[in-house]
């Protein structure tokens, strides 16, 4: 990309990543190594702080499965924990933003069961298990 060929004006680098969701779907064990390597590669290339501006997994509120499988609340919690672990291991990560705060309506599709369900809260603003995991994460910081 010619815009990035001279990174003089580039202050920070932002990426959206969905390892184990859109890439390697359902393979939770791929998140940490793939996210960590991706973050390190971008940082090595541009030598700038990185913000992960999107990461998330669709979850049907109330769906529980062990071992965790896609769309279960347990999967979303583990998904977020593995991404957080990768980001926390890189001191150049300047921020992160879960996609999304709450579920919202979108067009229908194979990956859109009654809207986007990547929220840590439902459309009615009721917490999913992930909301409690994220609360715990930030209270411990």
Name every feature range the model reports, one short phrase each:
Residues 138-141:
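Surface beta-strand/loop "capping" patches
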